[in-house]
Regions:
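Conserved beta-strand hairpin/beta-sheet module of binuclear metal-dependent hydrolase folds
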Residues: 275-315, 403-422
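Active-site metal-binding motif and surrounding structural segment of the metallo-beta-lactamase
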Residues: 308-352
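Flexible, processing/modification-adjacent segments and terminal tails
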Residues: 26-33, 110-185, 194, 204-208, ...
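Short, hydrophobic/aromatic-rich segments at coil-to-beta transitions
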Residues: 49-56, 88-95, 169-177, 195-199, ...
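Bacterial N-terminal signal peptides
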Residues: 8-16
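Zn-dependent metallo-beta-lactamase
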Residues: 238-298
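N-terminal mature ectodomain segment of secretory-pathway/periplasmic proteins
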Residues: 37-124, 159, 164
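Gly/Pro-enriched, hydrophobic low-complexity segments
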Residues: 169-257, 407-409, 416-417, 422-423, ...
Length: 440
């Protein structure tokens, strides 16, 4: 009897596996068919023969989650850019200007093997790129350019998967999921009527659902180029970009030139995680521009900073001070500065945040309802074991309406984030709007 049941069960499982295999095969083949139709719609042989693309753009940015205020309406800023790519030789170039959040920029990136540079025209510097990565650098440009995205999808069709049909705003779409070389998986929506890529989306860690919208296609030398691109973060408009000019298979020589008047400065090496004891019982731990400060208060640790990587920084701290983290201070509400909320939450620490940022902090937590929070409206003071930490809201600033800093008066140490920035090396760039403002 047991043998009979086992054989019957084996037969059922085998049938299930065959059905599952057939379904997977069907969805893979359907994805290939959708991709083939999309390639033809976006230029066919012309698209397959695409070697270089140069795109000049103008954009309006809506700083979702990155504005001076924690709620809409979001701050607006403008930018202009030139992006150029050589698919055969793995070359990518970006140059552009931007302003927003109290900062202004005019710079660029050249990824070209050993001749790769980070350019800062405001500072007048050119820094070699230590580890040039074509896929990572060009990825954002590829994701917002349907011709390149469809080309990439064709090249990676073996990992594409048909997700089904969707109707959005009365329009029917074939939906295909796939992964690029780097970054989260992408879901692409192709119009069932003309097979054009109209939308895509992916989940971006720390930000949530990001959506791409492609409008107003024109043919440029036989290749479909969208004239308008819109970007959304969790449904909120984040970027509206218009293409001013596009060139297909044009040489990139002029874009590869590094201006002779730029000062060559040393290569900017990746900054590994390091721990520095900047004063007795005060540690600065971090790397690559993201740091947290930890202060020994006797029976507990006070921590300042909420960027990504807080768990690794706490782990490093435990090597020299195995004490509970009682407080974790967030400098401000921007999404890249609340990524550490869950780490402090897991430690059982009480979060210190500006009163206006409490809602954002709770939304960033695993369980916002039980998150322990101490809000600051002007300033507060922690005193323990003969040590003082003053937490001060220095807002409003050009970057955010409320910005907490941690000040250790006896040690003369101040911890801040995004109030001002300094170059890695070379000359100090001209002042930006956040620099000349004084606070008392």
């Amino acid at each position: 009897m047991k043998t009979t049941i086992s054989l019957a069960l084996a037969g059922v499982l085998a049938t299930s596996l065959v059905c599952a295999g057939n379904l997977t095969e069907k969805r893979t083949e359907k994805a290939k068919a959708v991709i083939a139709a999309a390639v033809e719609a976006h230029g066919g042989e012309k698209l397959e023969g695409l070697k270089t693309l140069i795109v000049e753009t103008e954009a309006v940015n809506y700083a979702v989650g990155q504005s001076r205020g924690a709620e809409p309406p979001w701050d607006e800023s403008e930018s202009v850019a030139v992006d150029a790519i050589d698919l055969d030789n793995s070359i990518f170039i970006n140059r552009g200007t931007f302003n927003g959040g109290g900062f202004e920029g005019y710079g660029g990136t050249i990824i070209n093997g050993e001749d790769s540079y980070q350019l800062d025209y405001r500072a007048g510097t050119a820094a070699p790129v230590a580890e040039p990565d074509f896929a990572t650098a060009s990825g954002p440009f590829v994701r917002v350019t349907p011709a390149l995205l469809v080309r990439t999808l064709k090249d990676r069709e073996t990992n594409a998967y048909y997700l089904g049909e969707e109707t959005i705003d009365g329009k029917d779409y074939d939906v295909v999921g796939f992964s690029m070389t780097v970054g989260p998986a992408i879901t692409a929506y192709f119009d069932k009527e003309d097979h054009m890529l109209r939308r895509s989306e992916r989940i971006f860690p720390g930000a949530g659902l990001v959506q791409y919208e492609f409008l107003d296609y024109n043919m440029v030398d036989g290749i479909a180029i969208n004239q308008v691109f819109n970007f959304y973060v969790n449904g909120d408009p984040n970027l509206e970009r218009k293409i001013v000019k596009a060139k297909v298979n044009a040489p990139l020589d002029e874009h590869l030139v590094v201006d002779a008047n730029l000062q060559r400065i040393p290569v900017v090496e990746p900054d590994p995680l390091t721990r520095q004891e900047v004063a007795d019982g005060v540690w600065l731990i971090g790397g690559n521009g993201t740091y947290a400060m930890f202060v020994d208060m006797g029976d507990y640790i006070f921590a300042a900073g909420g960027t990504a990587g807080i768990p690794e920084r706490i782990e490093s701290l435990r090597e020299v001070a195995d004490k509970p983290v009682k407080y974790g201070m967030l400098t401000h509400h921007h999404f890249d500065h609340v990524m550490g909320v869950t780490a402090y939450e897991a430690e059982g620490a009480k979060l210190i945040t500006a009163a206006a940022h409490e809602t954002v902090a709770r939304e960033a937590a695993t369980d916002g309802g039980t998150l322990k929070i101490k809000t600051v409206k002007d300033r507060m003071k922690l005193e323990a074991n003969g040590r003082t930490v003053e937490i001060i809201d220095i807002g409003p600033t050009a970057h955010t309406e409320h910005l907490l800093v941690a000040y250790l008066p006896e040690e003369g140490i101040l911890f801040e984030a995004d109030h001002f920035s300094l170059p890695e090396d070379g000359p100090i760039p001209p002042a930006v709007s956040s620099t000349p403002v004084s606070y008392t």
